[in-house]
Amino acid sequence: MDSTKEEEDLNNNIDEISDGENEEEELDEAIAAALQKIEVPSIPRRVKVYEMEDENWVDCGTGYCDGKIEGPLAYFIVRSEADNETILLKTQLIAEDIYSRQEETLIVWQELNGTDLALSFQESSGCIDMWMFLANVQKAISSVTRSYSNDDILTDEGALNENYLNTVDLPAPELANLKEIEEAVYGYMQSIQSRDSLVRYVSNENYIDRLIELFPLCEDLENTDDLHRLCSIIKSFVQLNDAPLLESLFSNDEKLMCVAGILEYDPEFPNIKANHREYLMDSKKFKQVVPIQDPRILAKIHQTFKLQYLRDVVVSRIVDEPSFSVLNSFIFFNQADIIQYLQTNEKFLHELFSIYVNEGEDDQRKQDGIFFIQQVCNIAKGLQFQSCSALFATFVKFNLLKALDYAMSHENNSVRNAGSDILVSIIDHEPAIVWQKFDQDRKDASSSLSNAHVSQHSLLSNLINILHKESNPGVLAQISEAFKMLLSLPGSYAYNNPYRNADGNVRNKTDNIIGINFIENFYDNSFNMLAAPLLELENVSSLDVKKLDMYMHLCELFCYFFRIHDYWSRRFDTYKTLTSKVALLLYSDRKYVVLSALRFIRSCLAARQSEMSLIMLETDTYGKVLDLMLKVKDQTNLVNSAALEFFEFLRSEGSEDTLDYLNKNYRPQLESLNNLSTFSELLNIIDGLSSDSRSPKTVGTHESNSYEFDGASNNNQRVGDDVSKDWEIQQDFSIENDTELSEKVGQRTVLDSIAPAELNIEDSCEQPKQPILEDRYFLESAVYDTSAESSGINVSNTRYSKRKSDFQVDDQQADDESPKKRLSIDSSSAQNGYAS
């Protein structure tokens, strides 16, 4: 009998164990299924791992943190940055509330075994990314474990405390219960599980609406304690970071205003009451230049304004990144709807921009219209690229540029600033939008002097007037940047690929052509106007700070034009005069002006040395730079460094004519700087030129036994007893042997820029076609390293480097090629695989 009873008990125990194991398996499967829905961070984040030892944080190494999900388990894994294999940390993420995010880059927690750990991220974005992964894992685990009430399993696993499973039950929303409600909410906020339960309870019971109804009564009774408690409760609800809950808080104007009123009574500042509602209800802040007839859009505009105020002022101290993201998403979708309405409502747009066509229109209304357009453009910049482009193109189509003519010529400084801000927003986004407008005007015009040219000249004239007269340094910088973008060759400013827009999509070839037309019109009608202050400059000492700021930006602009507008700048003798005038700015007592002038001279010289060097010799610019060097030789500042670098460039890259000029005209001044290594070496090179019968065209740090690719006669003279070896080197240095290397470097080989006759070898190879926007007049010293098997010589040595000007290559045909012609040629080349 006893034996039978023992057998039954044993079977019962086995059944219980089996049932428990089955429930554990079901729980694991459910958790695994929930975790599979979580998005794992796509980018490992750089992080330092710390462990607490003896009350001190010990650095355990630096690596890259990533999230990983394995079945029902989720982990933080940190791999060492040294080898990407050593695991510095692998910790299981659990649902218990043991994690905290501190400052912007720290995640700190205590493991179940009592070990304190911390992750210090290099960037706040990385910390947010991993924190969101952790929060999602905890929510997924909690949502599953709440549906299982087997206390034994939960206790054995140690995953959750049974208190987390208690059902949330708040006291009734009445004045008498506010203290109890505050304490209960505070308790539920302490764990992830209870916070989720609180969210569900508040949403299901319509608790917030019933609670908000108490606010007017509390204000009428002037019960400050209850108002403070009500504020604390609402702040806790906001911190739950639940999108539907926040949406219910701000779903309509009435409720939003109640929430703003409650948050005026912050218990952290008991003696101060904010005036949020007064600010939000001020109707003077809302102006309609053109009435908006759609009540739905009007409501969204008002709601967006209030949400922005709540985000930036009211709750900025109490919400974290997830809550900000929720508020930002509300604002973003509202703004997208508003922009869509404005973009598609032709009646509204026609009425708005017709204000600037009617001469008798009220000036105040025109000003308000400019500020309205500025706000719309600023909102559009935060939208997707395509939406923003569509809005800007629509505005330009409806004669936005006419409105900008008004704004940028206005006497009011704020109106001018708004107009320039609008223009910069558009051309910074995509200059082709403006180019296309002028091209369309040109096509529509019947007269020889097209409306496009007149309109463009008006726009550029306004920009030039602002640049010449504006006293605000910020606006000057903005207008200068606008010129660079508006007058950039397609692909030469900010984008590496000439056939790509800012969003990466393929640019229409037509956009490139109309961009070139725009630049041609600028040089025909506006270039001299822009350069006028520099061309008229006579005396620097009489200039005030405002004028000097303007000259600084002009130097930057013309430096940019000289380097980028190769085709046009070669045909303008103005640059000779400009260089002499810019050199006068070297005598200014303002360091930033001196640096701008020196940067112009140095950059232009590096871009096209042969031409710029002749200009500088004619205008004695070298002498003025030397005067500057003598002035600052004992100073320790950026001007000294920049001037010294200029002469270091001449030492290593200067032509024989330049050094001979310095020797004949400024020998004593150079000798006075002989204590500087740059000038002592420069003098040695000059002295070597006087006694060296070779007289190389390019002066550098040449050795006496160096080989030169200057022709057969020189080679025979210098190599002497090794002529055959020299011919072998020249023959090996061919297109075929250098194909792979030239592809890696992405430039033409040395032979591409040297006439075959000058190398005494036959032109047996077809010249490769060149990219359209390549600067054909500037070739840095070739940097090649041929293999020992092919030649046995390292051609990267500066002894074998040559600039195109040193070989006097006849490239007049390339000079005369217009960008449009080169664009057409390159388009066909691209089809054959040559275009970059």
UniProtKB/Swiss-Prot annotation:
Residues 789-799, 825-836 have a biased composition (Polar residues). Pfam families: EVH1_PP4R3, PP4R3. Keywords: Nucleus. One of its GO terms (molecular function) is protein phosphatase activator activity. Residues 1-25, 692-718, 789-836 are annotated as: Disordered. The keyword Nucleus applies. The keyword Kinase does not apply. It is found in: Nucleus. It comes from the Eukaryota. InterPro entries: EVH1_PP4R3, P4R3-like_central_dom, PH-like_dom_sf, PP4R3-like. One of its GO terms (cellular component) is nucleus. GO terms for biological process: DNA damage response; negative regulation of sister chromatid cohesion; regulation of double-strand break repair; signaling. This is Uncharacterized protein C216.01c. It comes from Schizosaccharomyces pombe (strain 972 / ATCC 24843) (Fission yeast).
